[in-house]
């Protein structure tokens, strides 16, 4: 049976039936084990081959050991290349359709045997590969290109197959393809590495992604801004901020100037890593690099400060933003309404809210919710209730946050019945209460002496399948403890030891934040052993709990588990870990962690550097104190005044008064400290 490929050509392409009348050894495309690696050996028969069976890697014959000599022989005996290919005479769509009907390698090779003498250009074959999305067929097609048709190996062909293999998450085979490229003396290019790095990174395999990045740098293949930016964004989304910072450092070391998007991402990263000064300094660096900060840059920095309750710093950034005439947007204004409220600047918050429309900025539900909360916290209950009802009269959107805010306001006025009525009202309007709604009403009822109603609601929530969040559990525990029902509170805590209706990570966080060290420890160890701890913040939460309770051995235990799991600690965790090593007198380990993190490109806040100085001092290693002091002294990112004061204090504590005096005199000489009056 034959099908016609193109009306202008006398060539025809055999369409093979899906079942064959004879038996042969083959691997069907649909049944190849996913876990099979490229370097495993299988016996496969291939048509158009001088040997009926032979050992092959998963998809192809093993490349000859002596690659150089084999390629020389190939060139020597290669037929004269036709100047005119048959590309335009072959219908690629029909050829692809025929390829899709093949069930194994033998059928595919037989189908393509018509073109074994390379009547089609390598460009045509690469295009064919790029349109074949099935990773198994694309591998077999690549084998035919190199082993049957004897095309010169092409990095473009490998790149296309790598893409298909990685889309199918066949990472072991991707490794094998890369090794095969090396064996064929092909140099992986930027696209090769970009595909590998991005694919491994998207799957959260950052150690592997960074390993590919290291190989790329060793091969002197230059990365581009897009590649580094993608890695930074992937790290940020996975909350691995130390790796994002490390990649950003590599980007700049490569001589690439970050663009506005990269800078804005890094402002967010530094903020999430609690490196606030570094986040602020990026604005300065952007100006120096000729990349003007925009509204997103400033609003991102504002968000960083607000999330960490640094409201005065946010006020300073907003003033700078207005000074440089950077346009304000709704996000920025909403943030600043919140900031004004947090700083008890209610008039400023009120003025900004009511002036939004004058600036041609239409307030949204977030704007209304924020000013409602500001009114409530300032105990301007009349204004809050008036605005809430005004929203309803003007059909302005209200959501669960709006109602939660108003329920909380009624709780402050001890009007628990009105709060209860609001819960019923929101449900009648089709607004579903959430965990915060329930925890707020339970808290209000508890304070009003309506514990029976609170307990009944909590029990209904547990049996109804509603998500029980940290706040809700803690609220009920506190409600029981307030009235002396310690048995009920302990039963809830006991339930959290073996949670069957909430994730273990949630249980750990609840217990840790409640200061329940023993219970949190028990659940954490069980969860870690069973591989349930996936969130990096859970490790940080446990380290923080142990550090607060001076359980330094446990701090080190969790840190080592964290590193075993492949997570990078943030600067706060590093500070607590260094302190724990110091308390345990394990100075060498502290020094190792400090150096390793710096080599990875971590940027430490001053407190970490100062803590390391303190550890060296505790060890009586003043040579290291002086060495680190001199290095930090030349670092423009370190607060010079605080550095000198810390070092002087360390020398003074060790009775090295001459050295302490020397450091203080150096401060005066450099104008850091005012000289004594004459």
From Swiss-Prot:
<dbReference type="GO" id="GO:0031425">
    <property type="term" value="P:chloroplast RNA processing"/>
</dbReference>
<feature type="repeat" description="PPR 9">
    <location>
        <begin position="434"/>
        <end position="468"/>
    </location>
</feature>
<dbReference type="InterPro" id="IPR011990">
    <property type="entry name" value="TPR-like_helical_dom_sf"/>
</dbReference>
<keyword id="KW-0150">Chloroplast</keyword>
<dbReference type="GO" id="GO:0003729">
    <property type="term" value="F:mRNA binding"/>
</dbReference>
<feature type="repeat" description="PPR 6">
    <location>
        <begin position="329"/>
        <end position="363"/>
    </location>
</feature>
<dbReference type="InterPro" id="IPR002885">
    <property type="entry name" value="Pentatricopeptide_rpt"/>
</dbReference>
<feature type="repeat" description="PPR 8">
    <location>
        <begin position="399"/>
        <end position="433"/>
    </location>
</feature>
<dbReference type="Pfam" id="PF01535">
    <property type="entry name" value="PPR"/>
</dbReference>
<feature type="repeat" description="PPR 11">
    <location>
        <begin position="535"/>
        <end position="569"/>
    </location>
</feature>
<dbReference type="Pfam" id="PF13041">
    <property type="entry name" value="PPR_2"/>
</dbReference>
<feature type="repeat" description="PPR 4">
    <location>
        <begin position="259"/>
        <end position="293"/>
    </location>
</feature>
<dbReference type="GO" id="GO:0009658">
    <property type="term" value="P:chloroplast organization"/>
</dbReference>
<dbReference type="GO" id="GO:0009941">
    <property type="term" value="C:chloroplast envelope"/>
</dbReference>
<feature type="repeat" description="PPR 2">
    <location>
        <begin position="189"/>
        <end position="223"/>
    </location>
</feature>
<feature type="repeat" description="PPR 1">
    <location>
        <begin position="154"/>
        <end position="188"/>
    </location>
</feature>
<keyword id="KW-0934">Plastid</keyword>
<feature type="transit peptide" description="Chloroplast">
    <location>
        <begin position="1"/>
        <end position="64"/>
    </location>
</feature>
<feature type="repeat" description="PPR 13">
    <location>
        <begin position="605"/>
        <end position="638"/>
    </location>
</feature>
<comment type="similarity">
    <text>Belongs to the PPR family. P subfamily.</text>
</comment>
<feature type="repeat" description="PPR 5">
    <location>
        <begin position="294"/>
        <end position="328"/>
    </location>
</feature>
<dbReference type="InterPro" id="IPR051222">
    <property type="entry name" value="PPR/CCM1_RNA-binding"/>
</dbReference>
<feature type="repeat" description="PPR 14">
    <location>
        <begin position="639"/>
        <end position="674"/>
    </location>
</feature>
<keyword id="KW-0809">Transit peptide</keyword>
<feature type="repeat" description="PPR 12">
    <location>
        <begin position="570"/>
        <end position="604"/>
    </location>
</feature>
<keyword id="KW-0677">Repeat</keyword>
<feature type="repeat" description="PPR 3">
    <location>
        <begin position="224"/>
        <end position="258"/>
    </location>
</feature>
<protein>
    <recommendedName>
        <fullName>Pentatricopeptide repeat-containing protein At5g39980, chloroplastic</fullName>
    </recommendedName>
</protein>
<feature type="repeat" description="PPR 7">
    <location>
        <begin position="364"/>
        <end position="398"/>
    </location>
</feature>
<feature type="repeat" description="PPR 10">
    <location>
        <begin position="469"/>
        <end position="503"/>
    </location>
</feature>
<dbReference type="GO" id="GO:0009570">
    <property type="term" value="C:chloroplast stroma"/>
</dbReference>
